[in-house]
From Swiss-Prot:
The Lon N-terminal domains are crucial for the overall structure of the protein, maintaining it in a conformation allowing its proper functioning. The AP-domain (ATP-binding and proteolytic domains) has a closed-ring conformation in the presence of AMP-PNP and its N-terminal entry gate appears closed. Upon ADP binding, it switches to a lock-washer conformation and its N-terminal gate opens. It comes from Homo sapiens (Human). Its EC number is 3.4.21.53. Residues 1-67 form a transit peptide. This is Lon protease homolog, mitochondrial. Changing residue 880 to V: Enhances the basal, but not the stimulated ATPase activity. Belongs to the peptidase S16 family. The keyword Cell wall biogenesis/degradation does not apply. It is found in: Mitochondrion matrix. Residues 244-256 have a biased composition (Basic and acidic residues). Residues 759-949 form the Lon proteolytic domain. Its main location: mitochondrion. The gene is LONP1. Changing residue 893 to A: Has low basal, but normal stimulated ATPase activity, and retains peptidase activity. Residues 233-243 have a biased composition (Basic residues).
Length: 959
């Protein structure tokens, strides 16, 4: 620190700041640096910030520095006056032009000499910034990384032209220092002076201060750099006279002369622009301006009161003098700069030339900032209050816990956990081997730390182990009359299922105890397999639990995970016992025929232990790892088909067929169950919506021919929903659905004809089939593919082509039938060689539907013989049965479904294998009523039925 008569100079690394002695005295002989330290007499500072950057950081001396700097700026040039002014200014100018001599390694910090700001400086380097524009009289730190712009700014500083144009980019996401087009920036910006520049090699960090608003006129080309003087490396020390002449010559040149004229070819990046000063509109200090000014000052003070971030700096700036308040131009800029508004809103204030409008816009932004500050303060108070309450509650709880522990009123956490688990087991009959495990785990729990992972694993294991209802059973209902009433109330038909459940109750009543059973209901969808299980649970007074294994691929879903895994838990069976709180629930395992298989194992194999009455008394779950007795559980499984159920699993279950419904059964179910349920669901009563039996019959016949009643339920609900809409919309007070207006509710009929052929031509025979959806009629068509050529020489053997998306089994059945038909015809009519020499095409209609199975063998033989003889079979005849190569008719399945399908199609005569006689006679009387049935053992019997008028002589007719 060097002192003289009027001034004190603070020496930095590359420049000095000149302060008046009264200011140094006011600071007590010390000066605050930008880093917050104090500079004492005789010390140096390398701080890069000028004194005006310290506004609001120290005592009131900061305001004096600000006022002094403003005064010096208005005075024009370096701090004039005093004997050190010329020398200090010269040395600072040398430092500003040539950088820091002997600064050593590290970044070069250049502090520029304060100089007179030119009123007109049209050619400026362009710096594009984002987010916040620079307002006049405000300082901003800017970093520049673009190499071309860095070189340009270095050259301008060396030429004593530390002026730039700072403009805001339209796109805030653009981080580049330069732009490729003037359209990427707002054309109104700020003329700024570089007060300090820190050269970091690959980038520049500058402190710039805005002075006035400017507007871009056009883009300029960057002028080439002038060659340096030959005596560049000569010593810097010159005579005072030479230095004075150089300064006079430099000051005599107008700054605008240093810029080059633009050329037609402009660079790709905008580095230099021509600007013109923005002139404010003339204004008078009216009452409106005074009111806006006062409101801005009031709002700023309110923001300061709410947000301490603004308090020190803004108070210092406003206390420096009332000149700020009296200057509407500066006040509007300061108000906008204090806000965190959007960039386009701040730019709007910068571009506004009408001072009252600018004041109004600045006031709007300040009001938004004030509301945001109030919201932040409210949220802060709420969070602080919540934290205080939580902390206070925690302290009180800890104190209460200590007091209770001292008085013996509260036990340790581990003791409380052990007491809770033992309390659960008091009323249960726990097996000895399970109780030993519980005692061992409780002892282990007492030795573990409360916060260890093993503690939580052991506690969860004990929680599951003590939640099992050991020895707890629900009181079963053994009253046959009550059970039968419940089953009849919930379901219509299903006599086989009801009879089996009543038998189970009767056996339990005679034995005086109940045992678990494994039943499997299989049949088409929608016949009530799942719902009957719930009714059985209600009839037996057992708890009900259902889970589906359709698509299940993980064995752990059934048998649980090992406790060593994170997040391990028991399987579905143990979860069922915990939920039902009894050891004798009814467990429904749904969709057992659709169980999957994955890399985790085969769940169907895991069910073998579960569904084996000899093994499930000691079922071992992987998680519990103790045997659990499931012998009292009634397991019911459901499936659509039995083919996909593994044979060992099927062997463990008692299979009960739940067949589809005929039209009479569907009508009864709809009237007794579906329509009342749908009315209640739609909020209607019988007087509001009427559905007659004729409507339901037509609905079943033309819309719902499947075996189940699920689709019928949907159609009934659809009719009642539309009825409810008409009533609510005011179209009608009540709705009566008739066969004539049924299409208005459910659309066009889905089924318009009963069967494909009303009269079957030669070569066409009706067969019977059944699928998971129920029974159906199936026509077999045969036709001549290529004419018979009796005069052809060589091989005259015929052929058979089959189509209709047939499976492998059905294709084999067709080949067997073709061979047998040729042999049968050759045996009974040697003269008829039609099948031997002809090329025949066999087709089963509805080719998009896959078909498979052996039961169409006799139907194919009959169709081939009908084609060979050229005579149709008996009308209204349908048949099913597998044929062997010798003509023996083998039994098939699905007799009930096939019989129902035949009756639905209007068939009056059916042919069945003799071994299926018992299945047919098990059917209800209303199903077999009106049917002529023939049980056959050999195809010769079928031939006599299909062609009743044919004699042996007719077979010999040549075609």
């Amino acid at each position: 620190m060097a002192a003289s008569t009027g001034y004190v100079r603070l020496w930095g690394a590359a420049r000095c700041w000149v302060l008046r002695r009264p200011m140094l005295a006011a600071a007590g002989g010390r000066v605050p640096t930008a880093a917050g330290a104090w500079l004492l007499r005789g010390q140096r500072t390398c701080d890069a910030s000028p004194p005006w950057a310290l506004w609001g950081r120290g005592p009131a001396i900061g305001g004096q520095w600000r006022g002094f700097w403003e005064a010096s700026s208005r005075g024009g040039g370096a701090f004039s006056g005093g004997e050190d002014a010329s020398e200090g200014g010269a040395e600072e100018g040398a430092g500003g032009a040539g950088g820091s001599a002997g600064a050593g390694e590290g970044p070069v910090i250049t502090a520029l000499t304060p100089m007179t700001i030119p009123d007109v400086f049209p050619h400026l380097p362009l710096i594009a910034i984002t987010r916040n524009p620079v307002f006049p009289r405000f300082i901003k730190i800017i970093e520049v990384k673009n190499k071309k712009l860095v070189e340009l700014l270095r050259r301008k500083v060396r030429l004593a032209q530390p002026y730039v144009g700072v403009f805001l980019k339209r796109d805030d996401s653009n981080e580049s220092d330069v732009v490729e087009s003037l359209d990427e920036i707002y054309h109104t910006g700020t003329f700024a002076q570089i007060h300090e520049m820190q050269d970091l090699g690959d980038k520049l960090r500058m402190i710039v201060m805005g002075h006035r608003r400017v507007h871009i006129s056009r883009q300029l080309e960057v002028e080439p750099e002038e060659p340096e003087a030959e005596n560049k490396h000569k010593p810097r020390r010159k005579s005072k006279r030479g230095k004075k002449e150089a300064e006079d010559e430099l000051s005599a040149r107008h700054p605008a002369e240093l810029a080059m004229e633009p050329t037609p070819e402009l660079p790709a990046e905008v580095l230099m622009v021509e600007v013109e000063n923005v002139v404010h509109e003339d204004f008078q200090v009216t009452e409106e301006v005074k009111a806006l000014t006062a409101e801005i000052v009031k709002t700023i003070r309110d923001i300061i009161a709410l947000n301490p971030l603004y308090r020190e700096s803004v108070l210092q700036m406003m206390q420096a003098g009332q000149r700020v308040v009296d200057n509407p131009i500066y006040l509007s800029d300061m108000g906008a700069a204090l806000t965190g508004a959007e960039s386009h809103e701040l730019q709007d204030v910068l571009e506004e030339t009408n001072i009252p409008k600018r004041l109004y816009k600045a006031l709007s932004l300040l009001k938004k900032e004030f509301e945001l500050s109030k919201l932040q303060q409210r949220l802060g108070r709420e969070v602080e209050e919540k934290i205080k309450q939580t902390h206070r509650k925690y302290l009180l709880q800890e104190q209460l816990k200590i007091i209770k522990k001292e008085l013996g009123l509260e036990k340790d956490d581990k003791d409380a956990i052990e007491e809770k688990f033992r309390e659960r087991l008091k009323e249960l009959v726990v097996p000895k081997h399970v109780m030993d495990v519980v005692d061992e785990e409780l002892s282990k729990l007492g030795l573990l730390d409360n916060h260890s992972s093993e503690f939580n694993v052991t506690r969860n294991y004990l929680d599951w182990l003590t939640s099992i209802p050991w020895g707890k059973y629900s009181n079963e209902n053994l009253d046959l009359a009550r059970a039968q009433a419940v089953l009849e109330e919930d379901h219509y038909g299903m006599e086989d299922v009801k009879k089996r459940i009543l038998e189970f109750i009767a056996v339990s009543q005679l034995r005086g105890s109940t045992q678990g059973k494994i039943l499997c209901f299989y049949g088409p969808p929608g016949v009530g397999k799942t719902s009957i299980a719930r009714s059985i649970a209600r009839a037996l007074n057992r708890e009900y639990f259902r889970f589906s294994v359709g698509g299940m691929t993980d064995v752990a879903e059934i048998k649980g995970h090992r406790r060593t895994y994170v997040g391990a838990m028991p399987g579905k069976i143990i979860q069922c016992l915990k939920k039902t709180k009894t050891e004798n629930p009814l467990i429904l395992i749904d969709e057992v025929d659709k169980i999957g298989r994955g890399y985790q194992g085969d769940p169907s194999s895991a069910l073998l232990e579960l569904l084996d009455p000899e093994q499930n008394a000691n079922f071992l779950d992987h998680y519990l790892d103790v045997p659990v007795d499931l012998s009292k559980v009634l397991f019911i499984c459901t499936a659509n088909v039995t083919d996909t159920i593994p044979e060992p699993l099927r062997d463990r279950m008692e299979m009960i067929n739940v067949s589809g419904y005929v039209a009479q059964e569907k009508l009864a179910i709809a009237e007794r169950y579906l329509v009342p349920q749908a009315r209640a669901l739609c909020g209607l009563d019988e007087s509001k919506a009427k559905l007659s039996s004729d409507v339901l019959t037509l609905l079943i016949k033309q819309y719902c021919r499947e075996s189940g009643v699920r689709n019928l339920q949907k159609q009934v609900e659809k009719v009642l929903r539309k009825s409810a809409y008409k009533i609510v919309s005011g179209e009608a007070e009540s709705v009566e659905v008739t066969p004539e207006n049924l299409q208005d509710f459910v659309g066009k009929p889905v089924f318009t004809v009963e069967r494909m052929y009303d009269v079957t031509p030669p070569g066409v025979v009706m067969g019977l089939a059944w699928t998971a959806m129920g029974g159906s009629t199936l026509f077999v068509e045969t036709s001549l593919r290529r004419p018979q050529d009796k005069d052809a020489k060589g091989d005259k053997d015929g052929s058979l082509e089959v189509t209709g998306q047939l499976g492998e089994v059905m294709k084999e059945s067709a080949r067997i039938a073709y061979t047998f038909a040729r042999a049968f015809l050759m045996q009974h009519a040697p003269a008829n060689d039609y099948l031997v020499t002809s090329h025949i095409h066999l087709h089963v209609p509805e080719g998009a539907t896959p078909k498979d199975g052996p039961s169409a063998g006799c139907t194919i033989v009959t169709a081939l013989l009908s084609l060979a003889m050229g005579r149709p079979v008996r009308q209204n005849l349908a048949m099913t049965g597998e044929v062997s190569l010798t003509g023996k008719i083998l039994p098939v399945g699905g007799i009930k479904e096939k019989t129902i399908a035949a009756k639905r199609a209007g068939v009056t005569c059916i042919v069945l294998p003799a071994e299926n006689k018992k299945d047919f006679y098990d059917l209800a009387a209303f199903i077999t009523e009106g049917l002529e049935v023939h049980f056959v053992e050999h195809y010769r019997e079928i031939f006599d039925i299909a062609f009743p008028d044919e004699q042996a002589e007719a077979l010999a007719v040549e075609r």
